[in-house]
Design a protein with these regions (language model features):
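A short, structured active-site edge motif that brings together acidic residues
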Residues: 89-101
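Short, acidic/polar
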Residues: 43-56, 113-129, 173-180
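Active-site groove signature of glycoside hydrolases
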Residues: 126-145
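N-terminal binding-site loop/beta-alpha segment at the start of enzyme catalytic domains
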Residues: 1-90
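Feature marks short, surface-exposed loop/turn motifs that line or immediately flank catalytic pockets
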Residues: 26-29, 70, 98-102, 140-143, ...
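Short, well-ordered coil/turn segments that N-cap beta-strands
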Residues: 15-20, 60-63, 87-90, 131-135, ...
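Short glycine-enriched, charge-decorated loop/helix-capping segments at active-site entrances
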Residues: 34-43, 106-112, 313
């Protein structure tokens, strides 16, 4: 596939990235919660994961997003291994705040945002990734209290001064929290939920007004916008999308896509697949057309998925007219 790489500024950091990143949650594999419940995206294969990362690189992707808690450290290890000698040509974004047993047991515990923990988590991520710096370090606790977040930012400023990180971000869907660190020069991005079926106008307005990157998790609505799900579909056994968790809006507790989401997708499918795009590529194109600050980070498990996602960069964003038509069809 011809490499065509759209570029985006990573907020006010001076760092430039491809207009889409590669999300590395799924490739970490599952974790085991304290009550014994397994939580993940179903079966994974490390060789497939490495191939997906390498294919993303070949297709022009330069941003790779992970978290220390994904697979209880495994995602970071796989990403570092896959990048290898190409590490200095890419931007690594990882997260901290959710604790786990770093011993191979994949045991996952609660949150911790104490200054001591943030410092130790950063060093552990550097070790797992096999790098001497993290390009974008992200607070992973979306609802952390403001006073605690201020203490976290003080530590992030310290890590920035040491050279352990280059910039930092808060992963949150709360606009007031997204604005909390505006006075800090190292703060350059907000990671938040965004896809064609779930707009986030207030957060996008904040990012545009303050010159922050809008890093978009869930750009394919947890895989729903791949188009492979029908009313008779179910996610695979062991997949958290069948857990009934409140924030899994698209799928019900049996792992089936909800009827109202299928109807919304049918309403906009023709626009998203215009001009030779696949549905996935159209969903990413909507995000780019929504704001010049956006950088979607669709997750992958295979090289084919990475290639299809990156192929969206050959088509570019939807037009303002198409964006407006979608808004009308979805009644917003």
């Amino acid at each position: 596939m011809e490499q065509v790489t759209l570029r985006r500024a990573l907020g006010r950091s001076g760092i430039e990235v491809s207009a889409m990143g590669l999300g590395c949650w799924a490739i970490g594999g599952g974790v085991v919660w304290e009550d014994g419940t397994e939580f993940g995206w179903g079966k994974i294969d490390d060789s497939d994961s490495i191939a997906a990362i390498r294919r993303g690189l070949d297709c022009g992707v330069t941003l790779f997003d992970t978290a220390d808690s994904y697979g209880a450290g495994h995602s970071e290890q796989i990403l570092g291994k896959a990048l290898g000698k190409d590490r200095d040509s890419v931007v690594i974004a990882t997260k901290f705040g959710w604790t786990f047993a770093d011993d191979g047991s994949r045991r996952s515990y609660g949150s911790n945002a104490s200054p001591e923990y943030v410092r130790s988590a950063c060093q552990a991520s550097l070790r797992r990734l096999g790098t001497d710096h993290i390009d974008l370090y992200q607070l992973h606790i979306g609802d952390l209290e403001m006073a605690a977040a201020d203490a976290v930012a003080d530590v992030l400023d310290e890590l920035l001064a040491k050279g352990d990180i280059r910039a930092y971000c808060w992963s949150t869907d709360d606009v007031s929290r997204g604005a909390r660190w505006l006075g800090r020069p190292g703060f350059t991005a907000i990671q938040h939920n965004l896809n064609v079926l779930e707009d986030s106008p207030e957060m996008l307005a904040l990012c545009e007004r303050e010159n922050l990157a809008s890093i978009n998790r869930n750009p394919l609505a947890m895989g729903f916008l791949s188009g492979k799900y029908t009313k008779d579909s179910r996610v695979s056994p062991g997949d958290f999308r069948a857990s009934g968790i409140e924030w899994v809006a698209v799928f019900d507790e049996n792992g089936a896509p909800r009827a109202e989401w299928l109807a919304k997708l049918d309403a906009v499918r023709e626009i998203l697949t215009s001009n030779g795009r696949t549905l996935v590529q159209g969903a990413l194109a909507w995000i780019w057309g929504r704001s010049e600050k956006t950088v979607p980070i669709p997750g992958v498990k295979t090289a084919a998925q990475a290639e299809e996602n990156a192929g969206a960069m050959q088509h570019g964003p939807l037009t303002p007219e198409q964006i407006a038509e979608i808004d009308g069809l979805l009644g917003r």
